[in-house]
């Protein structure tokens, strides 16, 4: 399945041409964050790249809050996320839309797949899937080998009485050579292809708890919102063939895909909300102004030539996909460097290891006693940071 023959407009080289040139469709990008916690630096980088790419092409941005999962149904975090984007100066032109308001659209799409005989109930548990020691897809999920694909109606009824099934989408078998392979061109990582039967397997479109799967929801939403360009972290590169296959089945257009490198911690971990890596609340306090944060981030990731404070608008002229392609390896972000970069004066520069070691022993009540043990007055910026960290314990 070669998507380049379907609804995909590829950029043309500049230069003279005698052929008539049609006006390209306007670019529509999107922010699609999940309110499962405060944004971290990696989330900011992803949103920044999506915004810069759309704006550099005269395009628009749609904001969609992906809150299908129970852990994401937190209005206060969604409101904080929206406030953070506004503070960064990453304005959007449409939205915010909330996925929890769009369940009827996902239900309609799923029913279309079911009516075509493309889905089946799956009773396998997560533990069973991992215990099977199956090969894993490019996104780390086990490749499903079809244990429930051929269940009889009687067996489905018997198992359904015991537990609710998930719903899986059938992918072409290895014998369906014309449709088995999905090909696409990623704006950063180039030509990609995946054999669905051997590298992906039948995948979920609805979980056993009734929640629609990410793959189905984003495909429906991107089409409904007119999204023509998807910019996101390279950890989602492996999801793209599944989404393209769903677009093909549902008769939906395929956007351009552009995956960007991940920001990593110094110990090799991907930055995450769960691990409480530096979030935007702390970054806003330390950098003070959005221009300082965005300029520093642009300098660290190669978007700009240096870390000079710049607004999002000022970074548009520096943005180039050629630069992203040249720096497509994952980028290590050093927390100590951030602490030092944002210190107001030399005597306020912090050793993040000391900060962490101290705050693990502190309660808010014990903070003043800790300050009294110091040989000299604590700089105000340091004191504020430690107070906040102590309150988290």
What residue ranges belong to the model's regions?
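Non-catalytic terminal extensions that flank enzyme cores
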Residues: 1-37, 61, 157-158, 174-176, ...
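N-terminal Rossmann-like or analogous alpha/beta NTP/dinucleotide-binding catalytic cores
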Residues: 2-138, 234-235, 239-252, 309-310
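Generic structural signal for secondary-structure transition and capping sites
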Residues: 90, 118-119, 302, 324, ...
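Active-site cores that bind ATP or allylic diphosphates and position pyrophosphate for catalysis
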Residues: 127-273, 279-284, 335-342
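Short, basic amphipathic alpha-helical segments that act as recognition/interaction helices
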Residues: 344-358
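Short linear interaction segments
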Residues: 359-393
């Amino acid at each position: 399945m070669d998507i380049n023959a379907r609804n995909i407009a590829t950029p043309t080289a500049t230069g003279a041409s005698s052929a008539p040139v049609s006006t390209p469709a306007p670019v529509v990008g999107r922010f699609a964050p999940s309110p499962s916690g405060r944004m971290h630096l990696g989330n900011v980088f992803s949103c920044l790249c999506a915004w810069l790419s759309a704006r550099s092409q005269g395009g628009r941005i749609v904001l969609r809050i992906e809150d299908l999962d129970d852990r994401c149904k937190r209005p206060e975090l969604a409101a904080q996320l929206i406030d953070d984007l506004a503070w960064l100066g990453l304005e959007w032109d449409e939205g915010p839309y909330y996925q929890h308001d769009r369940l009827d659209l996902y239900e309609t799409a799923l029913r279309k797949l079911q009516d075509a005989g493309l889905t089946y109930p799956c009773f396998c548990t997560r533990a069973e899937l991992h215990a099977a020691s199956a090969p894993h897809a490019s996104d780390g999920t086990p490749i499903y080998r079809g244990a429930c694909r051929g269940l009889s109606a009687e067996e489905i009824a018997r198992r359904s009485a015991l537990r609710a099934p998930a719903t899986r989408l059938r992918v072409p078998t290895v014998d369906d050579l014309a449709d088995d392979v999905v090909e696409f061109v990623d704006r950063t990582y180039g030509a990609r292809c995946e054999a669905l039967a051997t590298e992906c397997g039948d995948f979920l479109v609805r979980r056993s708890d009734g929640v629609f799967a990410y793959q189905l929801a984003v495909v429906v939403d991107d089409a409904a919102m007119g999204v023509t360009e998807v910019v996101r972290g390279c950890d989602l590169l492996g999801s793209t063939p599944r989404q393209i296959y769903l677009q093909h089945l549902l008769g939906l257009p395929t956007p351009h895909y552009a995956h960007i490198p991940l920001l990593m911690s110094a110990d090799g971990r991907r930055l995450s909300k769960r691990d409480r890596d530096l979030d935007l609340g702390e970054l806003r306090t330390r950098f003070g102004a959005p221009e300082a944060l965005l300029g520093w981030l642009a300098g660290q990731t190669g978007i700009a030539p240096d870390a000079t404070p710049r607004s999002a608008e000022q970074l548009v002229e520096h943005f180039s996909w050629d630069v992203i392609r040249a720096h497509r390896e994952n980028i290590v972000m050093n927390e100590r460097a951030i602490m030092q970069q944002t210190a107001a004066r030399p005597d306020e520069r912090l050793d993040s290891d000391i900060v962490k070691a101290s705050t693990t022993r502190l309660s808010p009540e014990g903070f003043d006693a800790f300050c009294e043990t110091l040989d000299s007055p604590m700089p105000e910026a340091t004191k504020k940071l430690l107070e906040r960290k102590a309150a988290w314990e």
